Amino acid sequence: MFSLHFVDEAFNEVFAGNGGHGIVAFRREKYVAFGGPAGGNGGKGGSVIFVGDKDETTLLKLKYQKHLKAPHGINGKNKGQNGANAPHLYVKVPLGTVFYTADNKFLGEILYDQQTLVIAKGGKGGKGNKALATFKNQAPSYAEKGDLGESFKIKTELKVLADIGLLGFPSVGKSSLISAISKAQPKVASYPFTTIKPHLGVVEVDGFSFVVADLPGLIANAHLGCGMGIQFLKHIERCRVLVHILSMESANPYQDFQTLNQELSQYNPQLLLKKQIIVTNKMDLPDALQKLTLLKQQIKDQPIIPLSLVSFDNLETLKYEMSSLLQNTPLEVAPNKNNDFKLYTLPDNQNTISVIKESDSVFVVSGKQVETFFHRTDFNNEEAVKRFNRILKKIGMEEQLQKQGAKPGDQVKICDRLFYFL
């Protein structure tokens, strides 16, 4: 059952930890001549990792914890000692949680208990001068700074994990039905929108158990946000089978059925491909049989199960129909629950260099590889700057600038710094 404060959407900013800096150090021991470099590497920054937890039922914690920050890696030490890697930040979320970027690009989802998803990856530690020593430069006087950890804004949504979704207009009897077929105890009353959050119930039929969701009532134009709107509709996407509950108290049950399907289609046409069961509730009313006869003439291609939650007529028939339809409906493809599913947000081509002519004498250079070495460089260290220039020449930036018409004395902008093209 869901907690009192059910929250199914949150907006957060994630910050993975930066890598620790490598350091410059030399061995200074008595009787050890020309001791050589001894600066250790920095440790890795912590990543932001979301973990599925079957005991979590809401995104309430995420709603109020806007910034999720993993710690930075520890700087290297002398005597060749590497800095410690930072611990990861683990964030527990309910099963059925989906992650998007701020511009609604899909990042990943959590479907199983203890499944993990790496949303923001920690930065690598910078190399100390011991690791940077080469045959040509056996005692470098520079070290690398740690890489920046990934950081960006995300949107998190919870879509309930249920096999069957009960849908219908407000007050058609969804909450009464889930109470009758399971041990769920949602609030039941005679006024509209009694259900304002999903309720789950487990139903068992001849040893086969499945989860049924009582979802908030639907009204016309729900796909535009009316009533519970999209807050309701998004939960249907997880369900394998939909049960349309039509009230015989309605003046036109067939019109209600059409409106329900129209709203599903407007929100996501794929929802109409799901298996459906039509249930007519409140069959104990005086004119219910007459309305049912007309409805069967209007809906000829789908069976209709008449139901009364007063006398519980046909309740077992409905349960067996749910069970049978579910067992003949394949599961949607999902990540292997035995393996952690991790997302890394590295671009497809890290070696691409982009050179844009901003004005007659200013050129902007960007690209993952260029920016990585930029952040690793200590620009207060002359030897480190010389190394940076050698790397840029080696990866072809100088050639790219010349192709764009750069001349000696022109300015080159990389990240937040200006350099002169020589």
Curated annotation (Swiss-Prot):
Residues bound to Mg(2+): 175, 195
Domain named OCT: residues: 345-422
Cofactor: Mg(2+)
Enzyme class, first EC level, given as a word: hydrolase
GO CC terms in record: cytoplasm
InterPro entries from the UniProt entry: G_OBG (IPR031167), GTP-bd (IPR006073), GTP-bd_Obg/CgtA (IPR014100), GTP-bd_prot_GTP1/OBG_C_sf (IPR036346), GTP1_OBG_dom (IPR006169), GTP1_OBG_dom_sf (IPR036726), OBG_GTPase (IPR045086), OCT_dom (IPR015349)
SUPFAM superfamilies noted in UniProt: Obg GTP-binding protein C-terminal domain, Obg GTP-binding protein N-terminal domain, P-loop containing nucleoside triphosphate hydrolases
Main location: cytoplasm
UniProt GO molecular function: GTP binding; GTPase activity; magnesium ion binding
Domain OBG-type G: from-to ranges: 162-327
Domain Obg stretches: 4-161
Cellular compartment(s): Cytoplasm
Chain positions recorded as GTP binding sites: 168-175, 193-197, 214-217, 281-284, 308-310
UniProt superkingdom: Bacteria
EC number: 3.6.5.-
Pfam families, alphabetized: DUF1967, GTP1_OBG, MMR_HSR1
One GO term of the biological process aspect: ribosome biogenesis
Subunit description: Monomer.
NCBIfam families: Obg_CgtA, Obg_CgtA_exten, PRK12296.1, PRK12297.1, PRK12299.1, small_GTP
Function: An essential GTPase which binds GTP, GDP and possibly (p)ppGpp with moderate affinity, with high nucleotide exchange rates and a fairly low GTP hydrolysis rate. Plays a role in control of the cell cycle, stress response, ribosome biogenesis and in those bacteria that undergo differentiation, in morphogenesis control.
Family from the record: Belongs to the TRAFAC class OBG-HflX-like GTPase superfamily. OBG GTPase family.
Name of the protein this chain belongs to: GTPase Obg
UniProt organism field: Onion yellows phytoplasma (strain OY-M)
